[in-house]
């Protein structure tokens, strides 16, 4: 249990953002609402003890710094959940070289801007529900070189353009289920570019992009930049983009230029209405590279 003096902490907050739980190794050393003391970081600086280690919570201007872990941290689950105009600028964790599990790390942080570049010492092993709800995060950079699984990485967010970095080492990723799930009923969506053209998914076994659409069907808001390395795996024969609707995918006509020429049977799955937006020349350019186009 985390204590300040003899007081047990039931709630850790960075600004208005609540920390739900803290893990060291495989042990959950603190959980929200157990038992009856609250520590708020609405200003100034402070520290807490975790297994004998002092963890510093420091505010500098509008920025928050969380640092001081000396034990190995291997798992984060639902760590930040709440509403607030906070900037959490530097996380300095001591983590195992084998990587960490990120499971629901940022949830419903409406109007929060979380700047976690650098995310010092953090190697991601799996990333599940990493960001969901109305969270806003910028400058996200993670060491993905040990990551093998991504599931629902970003779900129901208003600003998906800021989540992915083109320099991530994705060479060990075997499974991607719903890289980005985004539905929206807004009348206006800002143009979004997701540039992951340098990703090399050479170990991939399974891929689904996720559902991307909005109720305003006249919004061509997503430019999706992929490279031939994205489709380079010899172990995956089906890339599923069926959830990406035609009214979203602004540059679907460029798909043929993103695909490599192949000699073994592989399928790219497109939504039926997305297929109808392809000209015959664009369709033929895809199949000429050896790809089969399917809608199921």
Model-predicted segments: where are they?
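Residues on the solvent-exposed faces and adjacent turns
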Residues: 26, 52, 106, 118, ...
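Beta-strand-enriched, solvent-exposed domains that form extended recognition/catalytic surfaces
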Residues: 32-79
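A structural signal for short secondary-structure junctions
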Residues: 233, 261-264
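Structural signature of tandem-repeat unit edges
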Residues: 59-74, 85-100, 111-124, 135-149, ...
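Periodically patterned hydrophobic/aromatic "hotspot" residues that form packing/interaction faces
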Residues: 2, 12, 22, 76, ...
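Enriched but not universal
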Residues: 1-44, 49
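Extracellular/surface-exposed low-complexity segments
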Residues: 275-296
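Extended Gly/Ser/Thr-rich low-complexity repeat segments
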Residues: 73-84, 284-291
């Amino acid at each position: 249990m985390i204590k300040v003096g003899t007081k047990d902490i039931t709630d850790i907050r960075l600004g208005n953002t609540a920390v739900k739980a803290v893990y060291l190794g495989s042990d959950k050393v603190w959980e929200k609402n157990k038992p009856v003391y609250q520590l708020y970081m609405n200003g100034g600086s402070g520290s807490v003890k975790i297994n004998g280690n002092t963890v510093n919570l420091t505010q500098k201007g509008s920025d928050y710094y969380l640092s001081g872990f000396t034990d190995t941290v291997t798992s984060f689950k639902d760590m930040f959940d709440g509403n607030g105009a906070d900037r959490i600028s530097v996380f300095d964790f001591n983590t195992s070289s084998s990587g960490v599990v990120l499971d629901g790390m940022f949830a419903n942080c409406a109007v929060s801007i979380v700047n976690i570049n650098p995310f010092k010492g953090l190697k991601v092993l799996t990333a599940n529900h990493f960001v969901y709800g109305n969270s806003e995060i910028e400058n996200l950079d993670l060491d993905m070189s040990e990551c093998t699984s991504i599931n629902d990485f970003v779900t129901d967010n208003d600003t998906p353009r800021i989540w992915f970095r083109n320099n991530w080492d994705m060479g060990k990723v075997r499974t991607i289920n719903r890289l980005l799930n985004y539905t929206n009923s807004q009348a206006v969506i800002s143009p979004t570019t997701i540039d992951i053209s340098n990703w090399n998914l050479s170990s991939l076994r399974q891929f689904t992009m996720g559902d991307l659409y909005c109720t305003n069907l006249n919004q061509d808001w997503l430019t999706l930049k992929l490279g031939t390395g994205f489709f380079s795996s010899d172990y995956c024969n089906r890339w599923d983009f069926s959830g990406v609707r035609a009214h979203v995918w602004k540059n679907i006509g460029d798909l043929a230029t993103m695909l490599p020429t192949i000699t073994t049977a592989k399928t790219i799955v497109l939504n039926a209405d997305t297929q109808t937006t392809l000209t015959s020349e664009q369709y033929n350019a895809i199949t000429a590279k050896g790809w089969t186009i399917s809608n199921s």
